[in-house]
Amino acid sequence: VTKRNVVLITYDSLRADHCGHWGYERETTPNIDAMAEEGVVFESATAPASRTNPSMAGTLTGEPMVARDRVANPEHARNHLERHGTLAERFSAEGYATGAFCPNAYASKYYGFDRGFDRFEDFMFDNSRYQDLFEEHLGDSGFYTLLRNLRNFVFRQEAFKTWDSYIDEMVEWARDQREPFFLWAFSLDTHFPHLTPRKYREWSNLFDQYYYNWRCNQLIDEFDIDISEEEIQNIIDIYDDSIRFGDVLIAELRDRLAEFDPVIVVHGDHGEAFDERGLYGHFYPSLYEENLHVPLVVDDGETSGTVDKPVSLVDLPEIVLRAANIENGTPEEISHDWVVATDYDGRNDRRLTAIRSRRFKYLVEAADNDERRELYDLDADGREIENLVGAHEASEPLEALVDRRITHEEELLSIRSATEELGAD
């Protein structure tokens, strides 16, 4: 069986319910929708966490990342990726050329995401001496963030780097490789700030982009935002335009790499909140559907279908390896009765755990000695408003599952701590 070339496209902050194939009324994702018509759609795909760093660490290893520290500490992701091994390392072991183009700082070399890649371009400081100097003296300061953002704006790097500024590099890299190859393309276009070129703007204008990105910047670290429905809709407008622009990346890669007949896999790394419960974006961890439910579509030119049972993005390595003819089986055979999501809010010492079945979601949020438990019927209450804990027969079995998961995480952290102490001795 011939090993297939693979292109993995990750969209930052892309909600499933803002994609056309999931029923969205706007034509935001014509290329993802075309893939969905031809390939395999996972309708209940769930991110393992609500922010890029823990979500992608879990996605690329096949194991949720468990940590009790701020995301800014790179050691947790580095250790997790090393401990569990990455999809790129697996491809490399199978004789693949591996390349990544990822302008997201939280999935960069600094956090260890270059493991297994022959080439990893994160568009950060090219000179490591300057990188080390900045981090050593300014790394925890607001001044460092300001300088980095100014540099990013001038050179179109990190948060300001759109896919059209590096697609030539991706295509050139793929053409230079001996087949087979694995290419990971990360698009920040769907992440705040939403800077969509004029020709792709359908629902916003230039003023909207500047003003409502400024408003987003005001709201992003607020826990209980004060904003009108009209402003939220305007923010959604610039978000949807950015999705429409980001979606074009698929068409470009399919067209320019057509001779290699690659398997194409598209997914969001997590979602985005729009004041469903007082939050904007994903600055604060949240395990509700707006932050966890993501698109996941596989087009291998051979299999098609819809999977409505839950999958987690931690299933992505197995899905991709099957589509590439490395593992036995087909992608659509992968599903579960339930999946888990976990995250940690280091600012407020909030521990979040969720169990999601096809119909129900059970959430636990704990901080200090305070704990809140919630159960939602996603079929009847997709916006997760009516808490059914204790009032529905699904409460007891899902409570047992989530408690087992919480116990597992605490045991894992205890073992890890004890191991580190032994190593220190």
Task: Show where each model-derived region lies.
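Catalytic domains that recognize anionic headgroups
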Residues: V1-D425
